[in-house]
């Protein structure tokens, strides 16, 4: 018998059991409305933090304050069980303004990832000594996520060329719990396993844009971005407990705080937009996140802790075309 429960969080996905969870789409409203393109997008009335070079499009009389929330409706099915999950989440909050005829700035708060799941199932186990069969249940829950507070500057170095950089403080906590228990066996001991990863660091993101003015009505903007690989400062702990099913008290508790390594990858991106008379904009973006070259490691002699860590933090490269 298998069951599934969904936690109320910023996301409702069992896939967030792995890695940093569901990686957030950090594009803003204008970019989302165009399928997620951002690297070549340049609009003086919109904030585009995915390419800080775009900040210079704002004029001296404009101050932009923008926020976003999202609503999610998800249908999940598995092992004959169908569930519907609804949730809402904060997406972003940012402002943008001109500092100088050639310099503009943006400040904002973005989510980087979200973790939220609660999955359980029930299995049958046979005692090899007595031959008796008893049901046991497994429960997997998780919550948390990573966040990014940025301040960015764009500089118009030439008439048609702008460059920019975002400096960000990066932080968050991810909690994951795994429980194995025997609901119908009074003398059994239940097993609880909880891992907590708290990370923080600073990161830089770079961007550039060049605009070709074909004539008064037609223009093309080419953009590129780069984010270097980053090692995150962290505190990682694992707590395991054996809990008496009859009394509900822990008979043993072990807490480990091994040295762990967490990273975010090199990110490369390029794109372009074509604009006609400020009435029509079309574009294309490509990005690559080199997750396969990031390092996730835990230094411990406890094989169970090491296997759980390696299973949780395994990534492949992420390609995106918008």
Residue map of PLM features:
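Outer-membrane beta-barrel translocator/receptor signature
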Residues: 41-122
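Outer-membrane beta-barrel porins/channels
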Residues: 8-33, 80, 98-322
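Sec/Tat signal peptide C-region and signal peptidase I cleavage site
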Residues: 3-7
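Transmembrane beta-strand segments of Gram-negative outer membrane beta-barrel proteins
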Residues: 13-38, 56-75
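Short hydrophobic "helix-edge" motifs at membrane interfaces and signal-peptide entry regions
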Residues: 40-42, 148-149
């Amino acid at each position: 018998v298998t069951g599934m429960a969904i936690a109320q969080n910023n996301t409702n996905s069992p896939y967030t059991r792995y890695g940093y969870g569901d990686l957030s789409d950090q594009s803003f409203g204008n970019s989302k409305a165009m399928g997620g393109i951002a690297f070549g997008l340049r609009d003086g009335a919109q904030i585009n933090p995915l390419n800080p070079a775009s900040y210079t499009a704002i004029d001296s009389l404009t101050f932009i304050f923008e926020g976003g929330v999202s609503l999610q409706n998800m249908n999940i099915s598995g092992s004959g069980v169908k569930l519907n999950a609804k949730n809402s989440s904060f997406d972003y909050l940012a402002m943008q303004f001109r500092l100088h005829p050639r310099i503009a700035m943006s400040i904002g708060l973005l989510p980087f990832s979200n973790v939220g799941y609660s999955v359980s199932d029930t299995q049958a186990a046979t005692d090899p000594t007595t031959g008796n069969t008893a049901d046991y249940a497994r429960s997997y829950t998780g919550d948390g996520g990573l966040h990014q507070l940025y301040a960015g500057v764009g500089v118009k170095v030439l008439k048609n060329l702008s460059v920019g950089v975002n400096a960000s403080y990066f932080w968050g906590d991810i909690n994951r719990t795994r429980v194995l228990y025997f609901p119908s066996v009074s003398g059994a001991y239940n097993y609880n396993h909880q891992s907590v990863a708290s990370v923080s660091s600073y990161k830089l993101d770079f961007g550039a844009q060049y605009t070709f003015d074909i004539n008064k009505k037609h223009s093309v903007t080419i953009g590129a971005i780069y984010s270097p690989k980053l090692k995150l400062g962290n505190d990682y702990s694992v707590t395991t407990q054996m809990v008496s099913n009859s009394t509900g008290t822990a008979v043993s508790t072990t807490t480990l705080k091994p040295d762990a390594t967490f990273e975010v990858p090199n990110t490369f991106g390029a794109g372009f937009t074509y604009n006609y008379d400020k009435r029509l904009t079309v574009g294309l973006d490509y990005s690559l996140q080199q997750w396969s070259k990031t390092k996730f490691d835990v230094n411990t002699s406890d094989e169970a802790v090491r296997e759980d860590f390696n299973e949780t933090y395994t990534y492949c490269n992420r390609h995106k075309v918008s």
